[in-house]
Amino acid sequence: MVHNKNNTILKMIKGEETTHTPVWFMRQAGRSQPEYRKLKEKYSLFDITHQPELCAYVTHLPVDNYHTDAAILYKDIMTPLKPIGVDVEIKSGIGPVIHNPIKTIQDVEKLSQIDPERDVPYVLDTIKLLTEEKLNVPLIGFTGAPFTLASYMIEGGPSKNYNFTKAMMFRDEATWFALMNHLVDVSVKYVTAQVEAGAELIQIFDSWVGALNVEDYRRYIKPHMIRLISEVKEKHDVPVILFGVGASHLINEWNDLPIDVLGLDWRTSINQAQQLGVTKTLQGNLDPSILLAPWNVIEERLKPILDQGMENGKHIFNLGHGVFPEVHPETLRKVSEFVHTYTQR
């Protein structure tokens, strides 16, 4: 076990005194790291995620290289879907492709439930390896939110408009709610197993829920999010982070959920979130594109985010979306160092 562990992010969420604003980056594991690219010359994404030693190495790299205050498990949000009967393939340059999309309630009924120890032991073994032997910062486990998972399962892959997903919601509520309930059950079991293996925080990625308006979110999504988070927290008192893209119109709905941290994309400032009445710890929210700019521009954009975060009092620095593959690793290291130095107290 690790002594003198850096629990800054957990202290921030609890409202305890910290020495600096904690920082981590979505998609910090992999992508922009040269060590990861070298691995990808030999191993596929599937190979890496199914070999705990390799996966733990990739997960741990950004903590060593960038000195982040948390690690996030290197996995894909599709991980729990294949064991329940979803024929999913990750295609380079496209993303998840589903070969048996959900169209009817019979398709939902064919889905099985997940047994994490039986179906995804490599996920749990990776977490145990990290938490028992190596990691000196909290590990973030994660899952895709029911809407985002369902959108892939219904559309058959990435979508711009989510027409099939919305069509099912509006014209076949029985199938929609059956799918939501099934995915909540899967997510609760998957997340609970991650926590029991050693994950100390959970992030729920609702990447595409911004496609819905407030009324539809309340009717078709919110009750299921409440059940998912509540059932996880009934089992374990674990902090939960919720993040989505282009969902500023849903901020007040999210603030009602039993989450601990609300992740902002780059379109909504910390001050704006406060003015909207958000009471949760805030996470974010540098535009990831800024990391491709010269350092003086990056620093200029970092300061107001950090100033607003310090004024708010409960802030975790992150990007407003994931790290782009083109971002230089040294830039991420400098950002992490700047956040720690600028917010030191």
Curated annotation (Swiss-Prot):
Gene Ontology annotations of biological process type: protoporphyrinogen IX biosynthetic process
Transmembrane parts of this sequence: none
Keyword Cell inner membrane: no
The protein's name in its UniProt record: Uroporphyrinogen decarboxylase
Any Pfam family: URO-D
Principal location class: cytoplasm
Any one GO molecular function term: uroporphyrinogen decarboxylase activity
Any one annotated GO CC term: cytosol
Function according to Swiss-Prot or TrEMBL: Catalyzes the decarboxylation of four acetate groups of uroporphyrinogen-III to yield coproporphyrinogen-III.
Species whose genome carries this gene: Staphylococcus aureus (strain bovine RF122 / ET3-1)
The EC number(s) this enzyme carries: 4.1.1.37
InterPro entries found in the cross-reference section: UROD/MetE-like_sf, Uroporphyrinogen_deCO2ase_HemE, Uroporphyrinogen_deCOase
Pathway(s) where this gene product acts: Porphyrin-containing compound metabolism; protoporphyrin-IX biosynthesis; coproporphyrinogen-III from 5-aminolevulinate: step 4/4
Subcellular location field: Cytoplasm
